Amino acid sequence: MTTTDTTMDTESATRAAASFNRCFETLDAGKGLIADDAFFDLYPPFWRLQLQGSGAFGRQLRAIASGPQTAQVLRVVPTASGFVMEHEESRRGQDPEVARRLWLCTLRDGLIVEAVGYCNGGWGDALRARHAVEAPMLRPWETDR
């Protein structure tokens, strides 16, 4: 970053992150948020995949969804070219799961043109219970930061 680079203002970054987060609940990339040719570099546990385009991203969201879900933004950090967002997605229903993700999003003209996403995978009830016993957290997953 050079001395002439500026960080995206917090309000714009927060607004863009909230819109992006909504995709994980609606399972739709929406209009006016993601560029038609946006590049996605995704890192789920033990895998990596790349997608191009808002349509491909929307299809991927629908392919991995099973049951109603909610997504909550935990933190947004503006960058010179966009934002970093940490969020938690919770799936309700017969097999509830919780997943944490970290996204690095690049914006151009107000649209996401590139997104790199890291996911810890879906943690079901049994894994969360085992984790609580075997590796208690000093700072448990907070929903309010």
Model-derived features with residue positions:
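C-terminal and inter-domain tail/linker signature
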Residues: 1-145
